[in-house]
Amino acid sequence: LTLGISLMRGGGPCRMIDKLPGRLPWSRALGLHARSEEIFDAMGVLEAVRRQSRAFQAIHVYGDRGREKGPLLTLPMGELPSPFPQLLCCPQPRIEAVLEERFRSLGGELWWNAELLDVQQDGSGVRATVLQRSEEHQGGEERHLQTELLVGADGAHSRVRETLGLPFAGNDYHESFLLADVDWNPDLENDAFHGFLLADGNLIAIPMPDAGWRLVVTEEPGEEAEPDMALFHERIREALGDQAPLPDEPRWLSRFTIQRRLVSHYRRNRILLAGDACHVQSPLGAQGMNTGIADAFNLAWKLVLFCRGHGGGALLDSYQRERRPVAEDMLRGVD
């Protein structure tokens, strides 16, 4: 959506396809850093996103005795050399809703229920075969799209990357994590991010824009039991004391594992990749969505100029030259 808006604003008409029937209601991504806020400001969507967000004043990191001895480390927000120094907490579905509205207002086309089956390219363009599902065609109807360029911003399991046969080298982390979105009223500041490095594992507590909280805990490697709130309750008591209030049933409860991977090439002739199709990493630091937003913003103006006959392949090559080192640094940082 960032790429689509930027292309439409630059006079480069585009069409987006997504095999999902619509936006997902849940998402792990929710942190927006200063650079993403600057990009959204340039795109004309920042104020709408801010209205859906909670601004964090600080990041607190506590040791193995929880809040008993106070934070080991506090990072005050507001000191970055940016017009938007605060970290914003805004769940990805809300961000996507704002971006989709902006994209459509600019005349952009978005096809839901449209799955990419195959893609071929030659010196003059790209031909994509898409399976379009609808109420009239439950089994789907094949459609063929001819385009000058194609960008795969289709996530960690990118069909575009797979079709190109590009290596996605890296490894899996051994730990697994539980994530819960809960109604909770702890004795914690609701304008700060809280991380607890506890003796038996970690706890992250993030206040959400709607007064709920997001909790994340580490699990023992190989845990396969159905996830529940028991481990969250243990970590909360360890972090905040035996008298701390405990959340009841979660709105959303999920287990996830983490990979660290980076694609070998961001471009193969007229087909390019962006975001999680290029790089996946630990969610610590909220880098994934932000790096993908910056990928798209960097790429968009290059595509517009290329389609107008400027820069040629050298201009498209500059995308990988500029963005892949950023991903390499980011992966080292979150490790």
Task: Identify the function of each model-found stretch.
Residues 20:
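Residues in the short beta-alpha loop(s) of Rossmann-like NAD(P)-binding domains
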Residues 138-149, 153, 268:
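Core beta-strand elements of the Rossmann-like FAD/NAD(P) dinucleotide-binding domain
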Residues 112-127, 254:
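A conserved short coil-to-beta-strand element within the FAD-binding core of flavoproteins
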Residues 25-106, 117-120, 208:
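Active-site-adjacent segment of FAD-dependent monooxygenases/related oxidoreductases
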Residues 69-70, 139-144, 202:
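Short, mixed charged/polar active-site loops
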Residues 50, 109-111, 169, 251:
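General small-molecule cofactor/ligand-binding pocket signal
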Residues 1-11, 17, 99, 152, ...:
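Conserved mid-domain beta->alpha element of the FAD-binding
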Residues 101, 134, 149, 153-258:
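Conserved FAD-binding catalytic core of PHBH/FMO-like flavoproteins
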